[in-house]
Amino acid sequence: MARPASPRSGSGKSAGARPAGARTEKPPFFSPATRAFVVARAREMAGFALGVVGLVLMVILGSYNPADPSWNAVPAADVHIHNLFGRFGAHLADVLIQSLGWAAYLLALVPMMWGWRLSLQKSVRHPLFRSVLAVWGVLMVAMFLAGMGTGSEDPLKSRPGGSFGGLLLDGVSRLLFGSPGNPLVGTVAGVAGGLILFVAMGLSIREWAASLRETAAGLARLGRGARTGLSFVRDKGAEAARSAARQTGGLLRREPSLATAEKTTAAPTLDDTPDEDGGAITLRAAPRGRLSDSISVEPRVEAKTRAVPVVTSPAGGKTKAADQGRPSKQAALNLEEADGYELPPLDLLQIVPTSVRGEKVDEAALRENAVKLEGVLSDFGVRGEVQKVHPGPVVTLYELEPAPGTKSSRVIGLADDIARSMSAVSVRVAVVPGRNVIGIELPNAKRETVLLRELLAGDVFDKTAGKLLLALGKDIGGQSVVADLARFPHLLVAGTTGSGKSVAINTMILSLLYRLPPDRCRFIMIDPKMLELSVYEGIPHLLTPVVTDPKKAVVALKWTVREMEDRYRNMSKLGVRNIEGYNARLREARADGELLTRRVQTGFDPDTGKPIFEEQPLDLKELPYIVVIVD
């Protein structure tokens, strides 16, 4: 058997052999990330150092005093040095002020700007060239300032451009115009010097604009702070004056309280400044109802021949409660009226007129529509029979039993075609769970108006055991629907403009006002639009006036969170889980004459080291429900 040739056989070189003279590249000492980190930190340190140099130079120039010792004056031995950096600062400031005048401050501004750029991880390109430009710019600004001198003994007033600025201005003026101190030369030099310094500092136009905006914003904040301080002092002064007037015999006028009920906790004080600690409030939408939730399920009648669709008459006085809002049977609430408060009568609401109740159901027309609907479905290849018809105030439900083998998705996909063929605006098609029928909802030619009085006067609203019962309207069968808000963690009402959100909110509010007194239910209403909830201003159920300021709304919501936490703590003291159990426990203790106490540890016995417990009485009051409404 032949052996494979070895890769080293013969004089041939291996494929991986390195050519002669090739150098091996060594890996870098620092990785790219480490190098970038070191460069960034070095740039920040350089920027900090330049900023410190510029700041020190600015302080040296700012604390300049002509009486300090300098190289051109010999002061007394015990002279006081005013410069903050001592003798060195005095000599340096004297040299710069005497040479450049006010322009010397620009020498301190340039390194400060460079340091600011480096601290922001921005490079300063061509630093040597920019340094030369900075010197030239300072000299030209000194020329401009030299033409503004006065006859004062102060060198900054007599020679604001320093000796260098005066010499340059006079020399250039004599060279161009034959006379010293020409103002045109000084003006041109000042403009050119400003442009040169603009380039020397290394700032772009965008950065200059940003710095100007930040400066303006800082000045604006200082102005607002000053105004706030002045208004605070003014308010304190006015309050002190009012207090003094009351003490000297003025009439003591009591301001109305935000909370009108005596058995409730203190209402939130809506200050302009929100608290620091706040809680987040999570809103969860109620589950979207299915078609089956509003369809009345009746026993199916078997028939071998084609059955005439059964027309179910809409409900008259009978009503039903919504499945999701129906509470289990419980003890009736003790709805004792508050002192001086009476529940509003139904006479305040509009009586349901005959024209609004709708005309009597025309069963012949409904059967005709059922036959027409079967014909439309047959045109699209769907066979089936309409078993029942449920007319309602807004829509009419047709229960279609399709022929065996018909897919539900095929019928659901024909919704738009059914609407076109039936001359309807829209059609809703869905499967009724648990039954072999498909529900087809067609809008009525005339919509029935549902009035609140009809809902509140119904048996279900009066007899259903609920804590915060809401009248929501009618279902597709014409039966009233109520729900208990206490069973919902939150209730979110959403919809487009004109869809009835405001009507729904007002209906819910009135449902609570017609059922519960202020000592059982309190409201916090937030209406930044100042349109919908302002009509409830002044009702005794309000914990606070209707909140229209968004800042005060934040305070009100934070107060609500704190009140919720306090209630949880009080419930834990009594060992109950909800407000109803808490109030029932208090009523039971009050009826039995029992004093509610809590066993707490107050310390340890010094002799035995065992804990010492005491029974502390609990001063607890019944809690009302608090409903927060945000529009």
From Swiss-Prot:
UniProt-annotated location(s): Cell inner membrane
Single GO cellular component term: plasma membrane
Source taxon at top rank: Bacteria
Membrane topology of the entry: Multi-pass membrane protein
Alphabetic keyword roster: ATP-binding, Cell cycle, Cell division, Cell inner membrane, Cell membrane, Chromosome partition, DNA-binding, Membrane, Nucleotide-binding, Transmembrane, Transmembrane helix
Self-association state and partner proteins as the record states: Homohexamer. Forms a ring that surrounds DNA.
The record's note on its domains: Consists of an N-terminal domain, which is sufficient for the localization to the septal ring and is required for cell division, followed by a linker domain, and a C-terminal domain, which forms the translocation motor involved in chromosome segregation. The C-terminal domain can be further subdivided into alpha, beta and gamma subdomains. The alpha and beta subdomains multimerise to produce a hexameric ring, contain the nucleotide binding motif and form the DNA pump.
Protein's UniProt name: DNA translocase FtsK
